[in-house]
Amino acid sequence: MMRNVVISVKRLKAKHWLIIVLISYILCDYFGLLLYLKQSSYDADFSYPFEGDVASLVAQLKAGDKPKQKPVYEHDYFLYKSASDACLDEDGVRYEQLRVTFLVKSAVGHKDRRDVIRRTWGFPRRFSDVPMRTVFLLGHAPDDVKLEAEVEAEAREHKDIVQGSFVDTYFNNTIKTGMGLRWAVEHCPKSRFYMFVDDDYYVSARNLLRFLRNPVNYPGYLQEDVITFDEEKLKEQIKSRHLNQVMEEEEKESETFDPIHLRHLNQLVDFDLPDDVRLFTGFVFPRSRPHRHKSSKWFVDLEEYPYDFWPPYVTAGAYVLSREALLDMYFTSYYTKVTKRI
């Protein structure tokens, strides 16, 4: 009798241990511990999406040549609406030389946000002497006929909607961004800068324009408010307000110009960036980890990305690209693997 009781207790304990082990395994899997243990080292093993000379492949695409290596992403969508006239001049023939083009990532149903942006910071004639444009990047809602009809009417009225054939979901924001790059290259190639921004942001266009004059030294180079952004007018303001001041200070101290003073003078007079500059600016995450717990909105499986850290990146909510940087980003996207998409 006692022997049977001992055996029953042992069996009961074994069942309990099995349950505990099973629950522990499920929890470890759910919270990503198992995936964390299987990750590859970013510092030691990073190679993504493949080994190859991407720069030379991008140069081939820019030149219109057939690349030696097949792209891994073909931008396999088409544009329902292209806002193809958005960046043309008043004659509707040539592309206008724009200072900034805003590409606003917007959900299909966010017409109220788009209307606010059109009336405020996205208004294209906000500054009379600064040519700007604003377009809105949308996916589509195939199951909502009424909403699609509303977008159609909105596009006819404002002519600023760029809509792709992919479903408008959170995980397709990567495709939406790629669509913005493609649209800029095909339909707005003469803008000096491009700002990608979400539709729940407010952008101070004035501060942005000031920043783009001298990104490295902003805001220190601004001694006084600037009312106009016309290049010739700005140069005259700078000459009259700052150049004489620097010269007077030099005469008082009876010193000759040295490189530091000359550099300061150049910052005041030659203030604009070169046309071929590669500028990519925004809030930088230098080192962050992929989310491996399956409850996370940003969960990433090892098959999608196997490394323990992301490369340094600029957050997607708001960032600015110069024309050359945008061209590089667009053509490089052909050799960048797209992860989640729906």
PLM region descriptions:
Residues 1-342:
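Secretory-pathway lumenal glyco-enzymes, predominantly type II signal-anchor Golgi glycosyltransferases
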